[in-house]
A protein has these predicted regions:
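Conserved phosphate-binding/catalytic loop of the ribokinase/pfkB sugar-kinase fold
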Residues: 102
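Carbohydrate-associated surface elements
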Residues: 105
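Anionic group-transfer/hydrolysis microenvironments
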Residues: 10, 93, 212, 271, ...
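Active-site core segments that coordinate phosphate-bearing ligands/cofactors
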Residues: 5-6, 72, 110-126, 130-166, ...
Length: 522
């Protein structure tokens, strides 16, 4: 039996999954971590990356031995995935030059706007190229020493293999991709170099960006140093082949088998984003719509919101804390299930309650920062059912505003495949999202495995693919042929209730603007 390892560094958890050649999960391990807000920047410390990789692999290896009775000694392929975008730069000796600036930051507005106008292509603030221009334009002390700019997935892949490469889907969140060549767009690279010329830097853009590879290509092998980094016990041997590292968007597409034109998926966890694979790339400049690619290079339209479940999780933790103080500490899974299910019996419009869940800025609604808030009027129907429903609607609201833009552009999709934390409690998030987006929402049993499973599948494809076998055929015929899919269609009451909720939500955004202006973050 061939065993494939997938590792994903998510916003709140680093997860490792081992699968067989048919995609069946064999063992898993994980490590919880959180981003830090330091000196005005959302970041993670790279020492925590090392710790998280080791702990998640250690837990996976123990889980494998417990389940199968033998130690995990041979792995046939490995893949690494992580949160896309951000800014992670190193010098020639691979010393870190600046704090890791994650996707969550909204500090590059001027650079993103300038690049959008220069390229005629929407460049979001979280993209690596926007962060690079921001650092150069600001005259930051490290810019002349940059030898390598990469993402978190690219960084970890380099540490394990010594190869400075990324998958094309991951690359599309660094710099725009030309889907006819599956490489960085040459015209935009040239324009970027021209913009930076006045700063007399010792490098050109392509000098510092990772090489772009497509799904199925070999991306290097586990080095001795990489094996020790992942497994300090020495049980893991060097020489294991790697697939190209991909971002959470690409692994989400793979995990839901949504990589063919006119298919789509929605990932709902710490952030929320919907991706629809297109027949051909959008040509119109849509500043609030991101244009990325699948792991095979097909054009994708993405609607992205920085915050989804963070505020929900904070409230659930508050309820848990209250119950614990009363001497009745709850089972977290049961607490989530109870609270989420209560939302299904609330008033369709949440009884006049409204929540703004912004923990960070949001491009779609033009916020540079966020302040989570909850508002009600004296005559609101303030019940736990309506409260939870308002929190769940808020988690979907910004996505809905972006999806409306795609509807205006006549981008169509028959259904969206959902995955992520919002769907862990069966039915609830799926049903409310179907009504909110007025689109059927489907969930696969396997989608709960998430991005670590998705990148493990890409590792399996890279190693076992037959001659001329496409990723689409591999997934259709070998992984998802017998997949169980649950689909929920929009409910008219949910749809009408969400529309009423959105009217209050849009009005409450003015309160949010005042909160951002008046309440400062320490």
């Amino acid at each position: 039996m061939k065993i494939f390892l997938g590792i994903e560094l998510g916003s709140t958890r680093i997860k490792a999954v081992a699968i067989d050649q048919n995609g069946k999960p064999l063992a898993s391990g994980g490590f919880d971590w959180e981003n830090r807000y330091e000196n005005g920047v959302w970041t993670y410390h790279l020492k925590d990356v090392r710790t998280g990789l080791q702990e998640s692999y250690k837990e996976l290896a123990a889980d494998y031995k417990e389940k199968h009775g033998t130690p995990l000694t041979e792995i046939s392929g490995i893949g690494v995935s992580a949160m896309m975008h951000g800014y992670l730069v190193h010098d020639k000796l691979y010393n870190q030059l600046a704090e890791f600036r994650t996707w969550r930051n909204t500090i590059t507005e001027k650079s993103a706007d300038l690049l959008t106008k220069t390229f005629g292509f929407a460049i979001p603030q979280r993209w690596s190229i926007a962060h690079l221009h921001h650092a150069v334009a600001g005259g930051e002390s490290h810019i002349n020493d940059i030898h390598n700019l990469s993402t978190l997935a690219g960084y970890v892949h380099y540490r394990l293999t010594g190869e400075n490469v990324v998958g094309v889907g991951e690359a599309s969140g660094i710099m725009p991709i030309d889907s006819t060549t599956n490489d960085y767009d040459a015209e935009m690279v040239s324009k970027m170099d021209s913009l930076l010329e006045e700063h007399k830097l010792p490098w050109k853009v392509l000098d510092i960006l990772p090489k772009v590879l497509c799904a199925g290509e070999n991306a290097g092998y586990l080095t001795e140093e990489g094996a020790k980094l992942l497994d300090p016990t020495g049980g893991l041997k060097a020489g294991v082949p790697f697939c190209p590292p991909e971002g959470d968007a690409g692994t989400g597409m793979v995990a839901t088998n949504a990589i063919k034109p006119n298919t789509g998926n929605v990932s709902a966890g710490t952030s929320i984003f919907a991706m629809i694979v297109l027949e051909k790339a959008l040509t119109k400049l849509l500043p609030k719509i991101n244009k990325i690619t699948t792991p095979t290079g097909r054009p994708v339209a993405m609607v992205h919101s920085n915050t989804c479940t963070s505020d929900l999780d904070a409230w659930v933790n508050l309820f848990s804390e209250a119950m614990t103080k009363m001497g009745n500490p709850p089972d977290k899974t049961e607490l989530y299930r109870t609270l989420y299910n209560s939302a299904l019996t609330g008033d369709p419009d949440c009884g006049g309650l409204v929540s703004i869940n912004y923990h960070a800025g949001e491009t779609v609604t033009e916020f540079l920062e966020g302040r989570p808030l909850f508002v009600r009027t004296p005559d609101s129907n303030f019940t736990i059912e309506n409260f939870m429903r308002s929190l769940l609607f808020s988690a979907i609201a910004t996505l809905k505003l972006g999806m409306d833009i795609l509807t205006e552009e006549e981008v169509k999709v028959s259904k969206l495949l959902g995955h992520g934390g919002l769907f862990k409690t069966p039915v609830v998030g799926q049903k409310l999202m179907a009504g909110a987006l007025n689109t059927p929402i489907a969930v696969m049993e396997s989608a709960g495995e998430g991005g670590a499973w998705g990148i493990a599948l890409l590792a399996a494809y890279a190693v076992t693919k037959e001659t001329d076998e496409t990723l689409e055929n591999f997934l259709d015929n070998k992984i998802f042929a017998d997949a169980t899919v649950s689909t929920i269609k929009p409910d008219a009451k949910d749809k009408k209730g969400f529309e009423a909720y959105m009217e209050r939500y849009k009005a409450a955004l003015e309160i949010e603007r005042t909160a951002v202006d008046k309440l400062t973050i320490k």
